[in-house]
Regions:
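Pyridoxal 5′-phosphate
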Residues: 1-279
Length: 279
């Protein structure tokens, strides 16, 4: 690798030998091709996706769907399994609200690790509080992290119960940098316990094959892997997706208003999660 050639792709450090950016795990710098792409959009392609039949809009809609296919290939998933969001935080909140609000009953349990990133923990705390305000009480069960920075799978095993519905996991820990053995954890879980995986720190560094991982939900952001801010990905298995309901609604939500009763007409994840104008 030629470090200087790589630096030239990033305007913030190009030609400035004194600048070394060490916070890419939080937010990566934006390379020239991405900046050029954004500039091109605003200069010559700006239109609304999936809203119109004129050539500029249909061309842009085709680009969005092409990007969806590429993300699906990146994860070894089907394009119908992929939704674009505003980032990993939004993806994780969509899991909590679109799945959790419509599938959890009194006494059900969600397993979380309080040492995970707040964006992987707070959506479940918020879900618990929201359900409580509607008269439904769920329980959050905290499991331990080893001093080495990996999950204590024995503690997870000991705290599983017949009421456990989902476990929230990080693929690579945001503080300790340890890759979690998702397959090992998955092996001790009953088949009916779902896995919501935060892949924010792994997507840009290691191969993610959702078929091998077996996670039911996978979330990550673009801003940690050289994309623009405000871009995120949510993956969901088809069979889980069919139990979800939109947490937000608007244009592009696959609703049919049948005698004042809303019905979903598609289980495509984008039809459930994406609404309004995309970033």
């Amino acid at each position: 690798l030629n470090p200087e050639a790589i630096r030239k792709k990033f305007p913030v450090v190009a030609g400035n030998e004194e600048t070394l950016f060490f916070d890419n795990a939080s937010t990566s710098q934006t390379p020239t091709p991405v900046i050029d792409c954004i500039r091109s959009f605003y200069e010559s392609e700006c239109s609304n996706v999936a809203r119109a039949s004129y050539s500029r809009a249909t061309a842009l809609s085709a680009k969005v769907e092409s990007a969806r296919v590429k993300v699906a290939e990146f994860l070894n998933a089907d394009k119908d399994d992929i939704a674009f969001t505003g980032g990993a935080t939004e993806s994780l909140n969509m899991v909590a609200m679109s799945w959790g609000m419509h599938n959890l009953d009194d006494g059900d349990e969600i397993m979380i690790c309080h040492e995970d990133h707040h964006s992987a923990v707070y959506p479940w705390l918020n879900l618990k509080e929201t359900l409580s305000r509607f008269g439904k009480e769920i329980k959050l069960v905290d499991f331990d992290l080893h001093p080495s920075g990996v999950y204590d799978w024995q503690d997870i095993k000991n705290k599983l119960s017949s009421k456990t519905r989902l476990i929230a996991l990080s693929h690579i820990h945001h503080l300790y940098g340890m890759e979690m053995d998702i397959a090992e954890i998955k092996a001790i879980l009953p088949e009916n316990v779902l896995v919501a995986l935060d892949a924010s720190q792994s997507a840009g560094h290691i191969k993610i094959d959702v078929q091998t991982l077996g996670a039911d939900f996978v979330s990550f952001s673009g801003h940690k892997m050289y994309a623009a801010n405000g871009v995120g990905i949510l993956y969901s298995k088809k069979e889980v997706r069919e139990t979800m309901w939109p947490a937000r609604a608007g244009s592009k939500t696959a609703f049919k208003n049948d005698a004042d009763e809303l019905k979903l007409t598609s289980s495509r994840l984008a039809s459930i999660i994406e609404c309004g104008t995309l970033n």
